[in-house]
Amino acid sequence: MRKLLVLLLFLPLMATAKIPVEEDIIRQTLDSESPYYYPNLMLRYQSGDDSMTEEDYHYLYYGYAYQDAYKPLNANSDMDKAILIAQTVDFENPTHESLEKLIAAVNDALVQDPFSPKLLNLLAFAYGALGDSKNEQINYNRMNSILATIEDSGNGLKEG
């Protein structure tokens, strides 16, 4: 009885998982006629398009693995630099100069890792601290959309 109750409680969570289907992602992101054609999705993402849907983010995030720019085994020295700069920022009272330096370093790191929640969070913070609410919101939305895409694929322990 107890196992049945636990199963019934987790059933809605399992039903909502959006498992990435490799063949579909490849087909959709490589087809220039598809609404999920990768170059177009990436342009929308980079421009801060706030009309991107969960489905757009699904194909954007998982389609990145099939792009020439995807090099998961390469070290991202720009990420290391951005983290080092972030460690020098006084988050209670940041200077304009330190925030501009952080933004530049994070943008460099995002070239190699465009969906890093850590980098997007730093960027949202820096823009917010500078009073640039537009870019703060763009990067906050990007971060949350990427995290939601990852979460939608399952619980991290198994698919679905």
List each model region and its residues.
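N-terminal alpha-helical interaction modules that lie
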Residues: K18-L99, I150, G160
